[in-house]
């Protein structure tokens, strides 16, 4: 059976990424990509995190997170340092510019939420999210683990 579910998901993903990029550009932020957003938001929610824990939170490999965090450090949004109790552990935390970026990303996320569910009743949103979560789990259960950076 051929259906266009993947095509629709891919198009929505592209539209959301484009919207995020355009909204960031309006704020003068051109040095990050949407995939950095997950790191910024997790650090906003949890404060300072060990890099390996951050990787688990955003479902990426430690290598991918290291690469993304290095870019955020270079841009001044994140700082890293060794954990006081174990110098083998690298911690990541938002800087002041990173906290401002997090607030901007939250505003953009709210706008996306309003647009993506416009005209869709709440009970249908619940069903949609449940089906998408199950689809994601199906891939994970069958060895299709998402391990690559998306940006």
Predicted regions and their residues:
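Charged, amphipathic alpha-helical coiled-coil/dimerization segments
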Residues: 48, 70-133, 140
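N-terminal leader segment of winged-helix/HTH proteins
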Residues: 1-30
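A short alpha/beta connector and helix-capping loop motif
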Residues: 136-144, 148
């Amino acid at each position: 059976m051929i259906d266009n579910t993947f095509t629709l998901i891919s198009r929505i993903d592209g539209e959301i990424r484009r919207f995020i990029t355009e909204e960031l550009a309006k704020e003068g932020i051109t040095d990050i990509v949407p995939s950095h957003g997950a790191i910024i938001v997790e650090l906003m929610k949890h404060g300072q995190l060990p890099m390996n824990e951050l990787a688990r939170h955003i479902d990426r490999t430690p290598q991918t997170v290291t690469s993304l965090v290095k870019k955020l450090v270079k841009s001044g949004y994140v700082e890293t340092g060794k954990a006081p109790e174990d110098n083998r552990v690298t911690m990541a935390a938002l800087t002041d510019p990173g906290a401002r970026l997090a607030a901007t990303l939250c505003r953009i996320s709210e706008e996306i939420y309003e647009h993506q569910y416009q005209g869709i009743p709440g009970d249908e949103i619940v069903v949609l999210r449940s089906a998408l979560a199950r689809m994601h789990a199906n891939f994970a259960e069958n060895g299709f683990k998402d391990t690559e950076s998306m940006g």
